[in-house]
């Protein structure tokens, strides 16, 4: 029987034939490097924009200046302030807040909220702060920094002891050395721009500032 021969050559029948398959064209090294640079630059710009937005609208790093909040906050410590919280939540007693000083709004102060709108604040004979006649828990105070509480309270103006609407009575934890509402009166709500949330420096004291149960040793 005669073998039928078909035209064409099959590659597996002839070792002398090399099949070259088309390959993807390699990108020029310069083009690849430029693309990488653009990608990194884009990511850096995005990160910078996000950082600016966070600082402007949400969280701001703040340096503590002074000793009025000892022992909870020491001079030169660094903290983060939440500037977003009070847009949606009420200011609560015991929170450490940052605000514009009413007598000079170019300066920022940091104190603890003691009296809320509508409350009457006073001090009992033992030197304990009372709200509407009831003593409040201030276990965050260090006794050695609260020796002259009664004496300093005697100088508080009577009209400051009733906290009117949209105002707050604030005090430093270092009661013997704090310039606060006892000396210059109430803080308008519109002047309070943030809550102290977290201490990030020094590292050995890093942590949340939310707790009011105990004073820091």
Explain the meaning of each model-derived region.
Residues 2-38, 57-58, 62-63, 71-217:
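Soluble "head" domains of membrane/secretory-pathway proteins
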Residues 42-58:
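Hydrophobic membrane-insertion alpha-helices, especially the h-region
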